[in-house]
């Protein structure tokens, strides 16, 4: 076989192998059945300890308070309530996001109180030190009272208060911006006759693993945090395997940060994160309580000494919402989504989005894609425009590869003559071929580059489409309402023309009866092959014949945005290769190659045509 076909088969086969490995390593996430619902537990979060001699124990069980003992949360993007029991932020839903494409479906609920399946909440408090005991400071079961009245809203903070009856008055003022950032100011007024010591803390607790946990290898779900510039990601299974720490009374990992950081729980699209004051030391804790099946992320700030008659205040923040790129970036760079006096930037907050191994590609790719979507107004068209930009970026390298492929065609007569002279002497054949390539300045491996260069770009774009919320429920045109999901159409019901429904996504039937977009992908790959005639070797010809259709089924369950990218990429590659081949005197017989692919017996090629490997003879140039 000629080297061009050999290289093309090698590159295509490698791409196929990589996608196969990807398919088996990263299978589609399994849907959670109703039977897998975790039974709610009444156990609450484990209170932290500030000093080695202060024991860490689980807070006793509690009962939920009636709705009248809650403070309503109502902002343009959030709705929910704060429980007066412990002052917990434990009821929060995102107004801008629905569970499904149906606008009448339920909005996404992020936080839920104890007593419901998979309780998920944020809790603040103080850890006692010195002469103080846990009964002297507010905890998970402290009943707070609201100072004044009214709901928590943008520019409408609420204040909670608790008096321990021993001279200490605790106040908690909670405010929220127009996106997803809560500010929590905790104060303690010392009206006793002696100085007291105590330390503020924040906890985000999850009872059991999330119901919709995808357990996808390529996706991080679990604890995410940053301390002094170092990002840490710990999946739920790994949290449950942490070593037992006696001082914590649980399995835990404790990190002391000196300058900045944050910690919390991240899902695919949502996140709840504790953000202490930046520029000051704090302790970051990841914890698991096996008996109660509670996962915790904690921040503990420095011990505070409050003199008699004095008041101490500590402020922190809580992010609870969608991982929108612009929003997260604004918090990282400016500390707020709008210019706000005193707002502290949050270093490294953009890394709470799971950019993956190819972060050096996924970050710039998404940045450009987001800008294109903002300019065009349609994510599908933005993906198409991004494909053109990426192809333009790699055009110089691709051009050299296509030129090398065209020169390889010119060498076919000389290579055939070499084969006849060398006979069975493979060493002689190899030596003469290398001499010929060097003499003609041809790189036989250059034909692999156009295909191989797509692999990291393909995987990076896959990651972007899979994890960024901007692609969630992003429509294109027609039947493609969600570019982050597979093509919903199906051959089974003739693409919606038949009166019966398409197979359920994720089932074997859905993998077999693919949609219109994967079929277009197969056709685009098949058309790209027709720039060259089928190889003379039967094994090669069979590989070439089956490859487009194998890829068609392999990628049929991938996100439609990714399949759209590959289709456009194939069409651009086809056009580039066709133009470059013609510019070097080769005229691909596309229709002839298509016709030959349907004939049972390959027609004998004229000598002149065979010499050019299916291309029309080049015209002689005038000297």
Curated annotation (Swiss-Prot):
Cross-referenced CDD domains: 5TM_YidC_Alb3, EcYidC-like_peri
Predominant location category: membrane
UniProt entry tagged with the keyword Lyase: no
Keyword Transmembrane part of the UniProt annotation: yes
This protein's GO CC annotations: plasma membrane
Stretch list, region Disordered: 601-623
Gene Ontology molecular functions: membrane insertase activity
This protein's UniProt keywords: Cell inner membrane, Cell membrane, Chaperone, Membrane, Protein transport, Transmembrane, Transmembrane helix, Transport
UniProt feature, compositional bias: Low complexity: 601-617
Subcellular location: Cell inner membrane
Topology in the lipid bilayer: Multi-pass membrane protein
InterPro entries, per the entry: Membr_insert_YidC, Membr_insert_YidC_N, YidC/ALB3/OXA1/COX18, YidC/Oxa/ALB_C, YidC_ALB_C, YidC_periplasmic_sf
Quaternary state and interactors: Interacts with the Sec translocase complex via SecD. Specifically interacts with transmembrane segments of nascent integral membrane proteins during membrane integration.
Family: Belongs to the OXA1/ALB3/YidC family. Type 1 subfamily.
NCBIfam families per the UniProt record, alphabetical: PRK01318.1-4, yidC_nterm, yidC_oxa1_cterm
Protein name: Membrane protein insertase YidC
Organism, scientific name: Cereibacter sphaeroides (strain ATCC 17029 / ATH 2.4.9)
